[in-house]
Design a protein with these regions (language model features):
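Glycine-rich, Lys/Arg-enriched anion-binding loops that position phosphate/diphosphate groups
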Residues: 119-145
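A cross-family phosphate/adenosyl-ligand binding-site feature
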Residues: 3-6, 17-82, 88
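Glycine/threonine-rich flexible loop motifs
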Residues: 100-109
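Hydrophobic/aromatic ligand-binding patch that stacks against planar heteroaromatic rings
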Residues: 114-118
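Short beta-strand segments
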Residues: 6, 33-35, 94-97, 128-129
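A short, flexible beta-alpha/helix-coil linker loop
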Residues: 98-101, 132-133
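Short, glycine-rich nucleotide/cofactor-binding loops
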Residues: 5-12, 105-106
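Conserved active-site and cofactor/substrate-binding residues in soluble primary-metabolism enzymes
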Residues: 11-14, 18, 71-75, 87, ...
């Protein structure tokens, strides 16, 4: 299974990196396209009238990791329309977000908005969030995914 991973906390965020390691251990093919820094509460915003910059920051053989200068939604769009145009994923997962996304929080969540792009491309997608991100809890959450 080919999975696109993204988030709103940035490419180097512990939640995303832990989820990447967990899914890689289950022999999933992964592509990671995430913001180059923190973009929490970006909601469903997109970058317009401004250039987006992308940088390959792959560290693990066989897993492509790309940092994008835009929002979480920009990351999914860049992945689907450029990087994975001829190699569509089977699933999009956004997270693990550092902080709950409950109630009206989902309206402002970049994590949730990135996952909401999935159906636009005909793909299943979901977001994962947690509060109290310790290494142990993050690993447990990644294992549940």
């Amino acid at each position: 299974m080919h999975i696109l991973l993204t988030n709103d906390d940035g490419l180097k965020a512990p939640g995303l990196q832990t989820l990447k390691r967990e899914l890689a251990s289950h022999d999933c093919r992964l592509t990671v396209v995430a913001p180059n820094g923190q973009r929490s509460a970006a909601s469903h915003s997109m970058t317009i009238n401004k250039a987006l910059y992308c940088r390959d920051e792959s560290t693990v053989p066989g897993i492509r990791e790309i940092a994008v200068s835009g929002t979480p939604v920009d990351c999914v769009k860049m992945a689907m329309e450029y990087f994975l145009k001829d190699d569509k994923p089977d699933l999009i997962i956004s997270g693990i977000n550092d902080g709950y996304n409950l109630g009206s929080d989902v309206l402002y969540s970049g994590t949730v908005s990135a996952a909401m792009e999935g159906p636009y491309y005909g793909l299943p997608a979901f977001a994962v969030s947690m509060l109290g991100m310790t290494d142990e809890r993050c690993v447990q959450t990644a294992h549940l995914v």
